[in-house]
Amino acid sequence: MGLHFKWPLGAPMLAAIYAMSMVLKMLPALGMACPPKCRCEKLLFYCDSQGFHSVPNATDKGSLGLSLRHNHITELERDQFASFSQLTWLHLDHNQISTVKEDAFQGLYKLKELILSSNKIFYLPNTTFTQLINLQNLDLSFNQLSSLHPELFYGLRKLQTLHLRSNSLRTIPVRLFWDCRSLEFLDLSTNRLRSLARNGFAGLIKLRELHLEHNQLTKINFAHFLRLSSLHTLFLQWNKISNLTCGMEWTWGTLEKLDLTGNEIKAIDLTVFETMPNLKILLMDNNKLNSLDSKILNSLRSLTTVGLSGNLWECSARICALASWLGSFQGRWEHSILCHSPDHTQGEDILDAVHGFQLCWNLSTTVTVMATTYRDPTTEYTKRISSSSYHVGDKEIPTTAGIAVTTEEHFPEPDNAIFTQRVITGTMALLFSFFFIIFIVFISRKCCPPTLRRIRQCSMVQNHRQLRSQTRLHMSNMSDQGPYNEYEPTHEGPFIIINGYGQCKCQQLPYKECEV
């Protein structure tokens, strides 16, 4: 009976003892052993700025996160983190790491984030990241990498973000990203890239944002981006690009933003933007453009924001296509687009110069009150919500102002047709003048014959006077030479000439004619 009554009391005791033993076994896994100089929060260990020269050995093997930022670690040995199989993120940025041995991250199968930025890494073995099959974010920016092994990122099929900013990369190996099928963000900015391989981005079928700014690219062939079927944003600013081409006909329907600011672009293939039917933001400030063909502008049908300031715009007849397009543009531009040449237009807004100097032939402008211009307190530029974008001025308008200005511009395209039309117009004017003169003469003869007879009689009288004067002069000369002996004019008017051949009597008549 005694044993029967003790058993119910002993069962809870046995359960408590078993639970206590399990807790004791799980203490290491729960992160109770915190390394010296580190701050521990549950299973996350923060050992930043503690002067570590190597990874501390006392780190708990069950930790999920380890931060060793801002220390003095110079080298990562082979199997350095092999026993930390539970790590999901590892931060090693802002150290002095220059050497990473092969398989240094072996065993970190659950690692999702690895930060190695701001170190001195100049080389990475091709097996460095092989076993990081769950890695999603890799940051290698601000190092000294000059080249990458073609198989360096092999096996990283879950990688979504890759930072390679501010290294010394000169080329991108073909098929470097072939196995990165999930990559959505790639930053290759601030390197020394001079050209892009045709298949350099093969495999990046999910890439949405690509950064190539601050490199040394001189020419861009958009056919090299053919395999980036999901790309949304492309940054190419501050390179040395002089022209844009497209080596083949294709449609890049996903691209919505293209930044080409700060290059040396002088020429653009007429069909480049036809491959980007959904492009919404195009920034080409601070280049060397002096004009844009109307075919290029007409292909920008979906554009909502454009940047064209800081170029070498020539405000002559060549600017009419751009002025016409700007006049009907429904979107916005953040900075003024000013003339660069000739001298008398330098510094003038393009649209102001076109109107003020009458640069475009047959220009017509209609101004109506339709839209509202206001100052956005969160931005530096003035938004214009209107049916056109004619620049009225750079005066600051209060947020309460309700000034509404809209212009409708019509600019013909400057081409050979204008010259031909002018020649035809001039020829027609000359022909009209000629026929008009003939018509006036004909009418005069039909309508005013007395006047014409008087004019004719006056002309005949004048001719007779001239003839008589010449006859007198001739006779005077002949009398001095010998045939004439005597000349005696009478008081009545007739005169007699006596010579060796006979006698001639000439009497002056009232109508001034002479009979012999």
From Swiss-Prot:
Signal sequence coordinates: 1-33
GO cellular component: excitatory synapse; extracellular space; GABA-ergic synapse; glutamatergic synapse; hippocampal mossy fiber to CA3 synapse; postsynaptic density membrane; postsynaptic specialization membrane; Schaffer collateral - CA1 synapse
Transmembrane segments: 423-443
Molecular function per GO: neurexin family protein binding
Biological processes, Gene Ontology terms: long-term synaptic potentiation; negative regulation of receptor internalization; positive regulation of synapse assembly; regulation of postsynaptic density assembly; synapse organization
Tissue specificity remark: Expressed in neuronal tissues.
UniProt keyword terms in alphabetical order: Cell membrane, Glycoprotein, Leucine-rich repeat, Membrane, Postsynaptic cell membrane, Repeat, Signal, Synapse, Transmembrane, Transmembrane helix
Extracellular side: 34-422
Glycosylation (residues): 57, 126, 243, 362
The LRR repeat ranges on this chain: 63-83, 86-107, 110-131, 134-155, 158-179, 182-203, 206-227, 230-251, 254-275, 278-299
UniProt entry tagged with the keyword Repeat: yes
Record's subcellular location: Cell membrane; Postsynaptic cell membrane
Pfam families: LRR_8
Major subcellular location class: membrane
Disulfide linkage: none
Domain LRRNT: 34-61
Membrane topology: Single-pass type I membrane protein
Family, per entry: Belongs to the LRRTM family.
Subunit structure: Interacts with DLG4. Interacts with neurexin NRXN1; interaction is mediated by heparan sulfate glycan modification on neurexin.
The protein, known as: Leucine-rich repeat transmembrane neuronal protein 2
Organism: Homo sapiens
Taxonomic lineage from the root: Eukaryota, Metazoa, Chordata, Craniata, Vertebrata
